[in-house]
UniProtKB/Swiss-Prot annotation:
It comes from Streptococcus pyogenes serotype M3 (strain ATCC BAA-595 / MGAS315). The keyword rRNA processing does not apply. ATP binds at residues 109-115. It is found in: Cytoplasm. The gene is murC. This is UDP-N-acetylmuramate--L-alanine ligase. Its main location: cytoplasm. The keyword Cell wall biogenesis/degradation applies. SUPFAM superfamilies: MurCD N-terminal domain, MurD-like peptide ligases, catalytic domain, MurD-like peptide ligases, peptide-binding domain. Its EC number is 6.3.2.8. Disulfide bonds: none annotated. Belongs to the MurCDEF family. GO terms for biological process: cell division; cell wall organization; peptidoglycan biosynthetic process; regulation of cell shape. Keywords: ATP-binding, Cell cycle, Cell division, Cell shape, Cell wall biogenesis/degradation, Cytoplasm, Ligase, Nucleotide-binding, Peptidoglycan synthesis.
Amino acid sequence: MSKTYHFIGIKGSGMSALALMLHQMGHKVQGSDVEKYYFTQRGLEQAGITILPFSEDNITPDMELIVGNAFRENNKEVAYALRHQIPFKRYHDFLGDFMKSFISFAVAGAHGKTSTTGLLSHVLKNITDTSYLIGDGTGRGSANAQYFVFESDEYERHFMPYHPEYSIITNIDFDHPDYFTGIADVRNAFNDYAKQVKKALFVYGEDDELKKIEAPAPIYYYGFEEGNDFIAYDITRTTNGSDFKVKHQGEVIGQFHVPAYGKHNILNATAVIANLFVAGIDMALVADHLKTFSGVKRRFTEKIINDTIIIDDFAHHPTEIVATIDAARQKYPSKEIVAIFQPHTFTRTIALLEDFACALNEADSVYLAQIYGSAREVDKGEVRVEDLAAKIIKPSQVVTVENVSPLLDHDNAVYVFMGAGDIQLYEHSFEELLANLTKNNQ
C-alpha cells in the first residue's frame, strides 16, 4: 500500500538516498531542508521529489515523518510534530525497521563505507533485483527486491537499530572526536554492532582493532596477508585500475579487475567478493560486474578543464587523505600531485592535527582552505588552519575562495580537492579561473 512520507532534512546524504528509494517503490515522497544548495538535491529534483523550505504547513496528519539526525527540537517542523503529538522516526530507526523485509547486506567502518556500499550495490543489482542506499545520496528501491544493501554509520552509534544478515566492517579508526572519547570507545561501538549481525561478518584482517571484535556470527577476515580467510594476491596496479586474484582456504575463487585506484579499493573489492562468495553468488558474475563499476559521488570524481585534471574527493580524515593521494599517484604516476584540503570541524582538526600534517605530506604541494565548522559546534578560537600549515613539511599555503590563482603555479599537475565541507566552492573558483584563461588565450 502506498504511503506519503515527509523528510525533515531531505538533503542529507542518507536521507536523500532513502527518499529516492521510497519514491521508486511507489510511495509519495516530499521533504524540507535549508535553502543552501547541496549536491544530493540534483537527484531528488530529477526524480520530481518536492523540496520545501521548513514550515509547519508542510506537515499533515496522514504523513509518515522521517527526521534527519542533525535536526532537533529547535527545528520548527520537529517542534510542531512534538507539540501536536504527531509521531516521527529518526532516519536510523526507520531504516532498522525497513530492512526487516529483505536479506540485508550492511557496510560499516570508519573509512570506505560509501565506496564499498556502492561497489556491492552495483554488483548485486546487476545480478538480481536489489534495493540499496548509498551514503553519496544515491538510492534505488524495488518492491520485488529480495536483497537490500546499505551503509551503516557509527556516528552517535546510529547503527545500533540495525540487525543485518551480513555486514562488512572495513576498518576501525578514531574519528568524530565530538562524540567518541577515544579508540576504545569506537571499538566498543563496533563490537556492540557486530553482535547484532545474523549470518556473517567480513572484517579487514590487518586492522588490530578489528581483530578484537567478537560476535556470535562467523567472522571472515580479508586482506593481503596469509592467515586471512580471503586473500587478495598477484596484484597489478596500472593506470587503468587494479587486477588481482582472491583465494579462500587455499583455493583460487577468481581473478578480478576493478577500474579503481589505490590499495584501499582492492581491499574494498575483496570484502565485497568475500561477502558474495559466502552468500552463494556466482563468482564469474561478480567478476563481470566489478569491471563496470564507475564509482560513487565525491569519491575520486574526475573532470578535465582546459587540459587540467581535477579530482574531487570527500576525504576528511588523515587515513582517507593518504588513500586518495595513493590513488592519484597510481593513475597519474608522472604528474605532480597538488592537494587542496579543507579541514572539517574544529574538534577533528584539534584531535588529529599532527596526523593531518603527515597525511598531507604525501602530496607534492599543499593548499589549505579555512576550517569548515560543523553546525553542532562553536569556534572557540582553539585552532586555525594556519596551525596546520605550520606543521606541513611540503610547500604549503592558505588560499581563499576569492583567490585560488596560486594553484596556477604548477605544470603537469593533478589537482586533488579534498574535504567534507564546502571545498567544492574552491574547486568551482579554480574551474572558472581555468575557463577564463582559455577564453583569454583564444
